[in-house]
Amino acid sequence: MAGHSKWANIKHKKAAADAKRGKIWTRLIKEIQVAARLGGGDASSNPRLRLAVDKAADANMPKDNVKRAIDRGVGGADGANYEEIRYEGYGINGAAIIVDTLTDNRTRTVAEVRHAFSKFGGNMGTDGSVAFMFDHVGQFLFAPGTSEDALMEAALEAGADDVSTNDDGSIEVLCDWQAFSAVKDALEAAGFKAELAEVTMKPQNEVEFTGDDAAKMQKLLDALENLDDVQEVYTNAVIVEE
């Protein structure tokens, strides 16, 4: 991937997230409920819950909302019937797409996901058809101007697996997804606050899209992300703004 688009894509992602904060809160509440139901309500001993709570804080969700979601999850009320289902498929020019959902009605969800794929030029794949093209990792992105040497030393000491600098000067740190919270805490303790910090499915190879193909691909991704049951959408497509 060209370095010039890395930072631009992250900033675009953050702006888009801010624009639909209400929807993000709804998704986070579902994730918090499920995490608490499966692993208990103590974030210090439940990595999945800790990650969801951290995301909620980053999204400026009130703490009372977070606490209520945890209590509902532990109590087995709302969220008790949510099922995690992953769908895989292809976008424009065969770009790989992973769609993670939390649903209480898998028939409804698969129909909506399939419809979005077919309506906007993609198609559903089978289980495992594209997941092998991605790595499950913790990812941090730091703004251009961050001290590369100091960050690299802190990151490697914290247990990160890889530190790389993009052409635009932004710095990316990768770690095992299970070590995400520990690495995040260590980096912040060392004075490094990431612009983006998440557990993600990172594509092993990325494909840039421009012009009409970029517009078509963005419409497909937006259609998938706007579905109520969808939690995350991952792709190896990079939309280059011209």
From Swiss-Prot:
One GO MF term attached to the UniProt entry = DNA binding
Q: Which SUPFAM superfamilies match?
A: YebC-like (SSF75625)
Q: Which UniProt keywords apply?
A: Cytoplasm, DNA-binding, Transcription, Transcription regulation
Cellular component (GO) terms are:
cytosol
The listed locations are:
Cytoplasm
Organism's domain of life?
Bacteria
Q: Does the keyword Transcription apply?
A: yes
One Pfam entry name? TACO1_YebC_N
Q: Name one GO biological process term.
A: regulation of DNA-templated transcription
Q: Which HAMAP family match?
A: Transcrip_reg_TACO1 (MF_00693)
Q: Which family does it belong to?
A: Belongs to the TACO1 family.
Q: What is this protein called?
A: Probable transcriptional regulatory protein Bcep1808_2379
Which species expresses this protein natively? Burkholderia vietnamiensis (strain G4 / LMG 22486)
